[in-house]
Amino acid sequence: MKVKITNLRALYDTGDIKISPITVLLGKNSVGKSTFARSFSLMKQSLFINRSEPVLWYSPDLVDFGSFKDSVTKGYDEIGFEYSFKLSTEELELFSRYNFLLRTLSLANSIDENFNKEITVRFSVKENQISYINILFLDYNYQIKYDNRYKVESFIINNIPTSLGELYSRSDFSLGEIIPQINLKNHPEELSGSFSLGGRAFALASWKEIELLFSKIKDGRTNKNTIQKILKKVILGDYKSFEKDFEKTIKGWKTIYQKYLGLKLDERQSFTSRLYSLIGQVYYNSVVDLINEYLSDYFSEVQYIAPIRATAERYYRIQGVSLNDITSQGENVPMILYNLKPSEKKDWKEWTRKNFDGIEFDVKQDSSNLSLILAKSGQVINLADTGFGYSQILPILLYLWRKTKMKRTYFRRGFWNTNSNQSLLIIEQPELHLHPALQANLIDSFTRIVKNEKLDVSIIIETHSDTIVNRLGEHVMSNKSNINSDDVNLVFFEEDKENNGLAKLRQIKFDEHGRLKGWPVGFFEPGPIKSFLGDAQNVD
């Protein structure tokens, strides 16, 4: 996944930030690190509720950005989000062949397995609405602009505007939807009540345009079925490959092929360019479904852990709180531990003992109350009687253990299942109240979990700790670790003094020897001590 954000608080333009297995956010205070880290939870809380605006700026359970006006960079009126992700050939084939809408139209092209499978979606948000969408899929470049009532002002594919009539999108957003579908106003499919397929009218109207285009090369015996047979044989990829494959395919229909060759060269090029664009129109709402489903699946597995986590209390009342996700401050950790099965509890304690210096965490019930217990070296202590460090690290450890042991719950919105199993853990300042040795132990656990192919976990760490950075470098250098330089991305945030102090981001990598390339010298060093003599001399 690559992410780009523009005009969100201090983030004027992040550039394309690669989310590596381990991504570390570094920089001084108030330069946009937390804004970037929390933007993932912002998308999560937006996607999983029916709402009247694309982005839900406040949620009591996740993050609070206030409002759009509080969030947009001063002097600007829109915020931009961009996400790029890759799908496997198998996933794209499933999309093409088993998409219900495309099956209905008998247009389920195979997709060129050698073509770039990356999909990029960009969208700009003004107050209460999306104003612009740009999608890059295969060799299609979709650009959609809206007015303030979600009427489509322009719909352009590969620089070719659509000519279908009045287009619009709904102004409300349903569960799992961030990119709205395009609808065709006053179309019979919409008025007949079969519009529940979502955007079917737009696809059908685009198909009619394809039939009209074929009138230039068809004979009297060519009908809709013939056109469908031709297009089902054409492989989709980049435009040049499509053009060659189309010409190769229509050789099986002698009259059509002869009429096609009878066109002038520029007319043939115009024909195939228009055809490629119209197939893109047919695909558009299905591509939107694909994007919404992928992003819903990705953000559903975001776990955010805040910098200030719940401190241990002496007693907890047994409650019926949510146990699916660990809350951002870890308030529900005692109840999650309480509800573990005996076999799970045994495994949990063995895991923490093995990975964290012989430490075990458990809960003890006394009537209707619970106590968090820490056991080490034969001693059992109420967690409230230990230092802050253990209570701060507990939610992180519990998340890591759950990822290694518990089955994945998929969010499935639509017609198509992916094999995605990816999860994203975001932690702000995991080093709080932790001795450097425990910080190193934590990083060791992170490296083990991100290299487990069955889990597909990525971790974003916002930190001020040189211990964490140095430990990652040791893992890159060490022959005992599976971590290499491509697995770690350090994102350095700094003030751009030439741009009103807004954030400027740089991505820094380790080399194969664990040395940082382009590291800002003295970043972790304090400035020189200033003289206080002047202050002392002014004291009466």
Tell what function each PLM region has.
Residues 1-92, 342-525, 531-539:
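Switch/communication elements of ASCE P-loop NTPase nucleotide-binding domains
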Residues 1-298, 357, 361, 476-483, ...:
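P-loop NTPase switch/coupling surface
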Residues 17-20, 96-101, 316-328, 506-508, ...:
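Short, polar loop/linker segments at the starts of domains and inter-domain junctions
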Residues 233, 278, 339, 433, ...:
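Charge-dense, low-complexity intrinsically disordered segments
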Residues 243-393, 398-420:
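Extended helical coiled-coil dimerization/tether regions that scaffold
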